[in-house]
Amino acid sequence: MGGSVRDAVLGRLSTGDLDFTTDARPEQVQELLRGWAEAIWDTGIEFGTISAVRAGIQIEITTFRADSYDRVSRNPQVRFGDRLEDDLVRRDFSMNAMAVKIGADGSQEFIDPLGGMDALLAGVIDTPAAPEDSFNDDPLRMLRGVRFVSQLGFSLSPRVFAATVEMAGQIERITVERIAAELDKLIVGEHAVEGVETLCETGLAELIIPEIPGMKLAIDEHHQHKDVYTHSLTVLAQAMDLEDGDPDLVLRWAAILHDIGKPATRRHEPNGGVSFHHHEVVGAKMVRKRLRALKYPKAVIEDVANLVFLHLRFHGYADNQWTDSAVRRYVTDAGPLLPRLHKLVRADCTTRNKRRARKLQQNYDNLEQRIARIAEQEDLAKVRPDLDGNTIMELLDLPPGPMVGKAWRYLKELRLDRGPMSREEAEESLRQWWAAEQQS
């Protein structure tokens, strides 16, 4: 039922994860599954849901429900039902309110009392009942509708769109964790650009992640797009085209957020131009603040923020002018994010000037070749000082402490500047540095 039927019609069904519904109560479901399933667990027994697995196929069985909501939180007052039709009418969208009744003899009957198939074939996201009632019951459904725009490439029905615009403020009843979960599904959707556009058009983005619609206020300095917002959507689309395999959540977030620092750093220059100096620094701080507010995992926050911080670095590279030291620093600063940084930088080239676009891509090709050439001679992924902390303490007769760390950092900078050194060269350089430190 629900999403399983929808995905089966669309040819997207994963046979490893199926949803069922029944008039049997949760305790009865558990009893029936014992001896058949390889494992059974309580997914949410208070909501009537039991999960099981057999032969690698996970199933989720939920008792018919006919819930009501308190209209303050989104928590339903769960009431188990006896009729499939009552269960379907409470679903979020018509396309999710279809079921296939399976008889004991294996017979199948398609159940669609609310026009789900018509909505599905038309590519329209509509609600079984009035959208105002549905969204009052559970405001998260507004964001879920936008998520389906991204996942399926469908559009909101006129009445669902209008109700979402009118009721967008109700999303504040929802916990940030639930919102973030829907945003993730939206961002990794096959039609993520359309999803982000709908998020902004409905007014939900203004309440959830206002930095995205805020980019509409800043003109694109290259005048290739109406504004930075439109440019960022193009970068997102181009980053998606560069993905290898599965959707990359971090890359996509970095693509849509890479220029969020521009409105705050916009300056009108005396020559009539517009500048956004240090927008990558400001943008990285804004990314951390917003994603922390949405309670994203720390690793995701740091990866996205670091990509935003580094996305402009390449633009200082022109005509092979970087030293080997600068190339090493680029690789070291990016660390494991380097493959994503390559894609983000390439995606950020949105100029319609074919000559300029070709030059930018040639320059980045050259940089990647430089990186590969240096990597053949040294391990750029593990650039470390040529002497470790114990050796530093022994050579300089130092106890453990801050000065050892300072010496280590000096040697790392030296390693980045010069490349690999012999032990004798490293020791001599350290002694010279130490002599200068003692005199200062």
Locate each region found by the language model.
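Catalytic cores of the polymerase beta-like nucleotidyltransferase superfamily
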Residues: 1-440
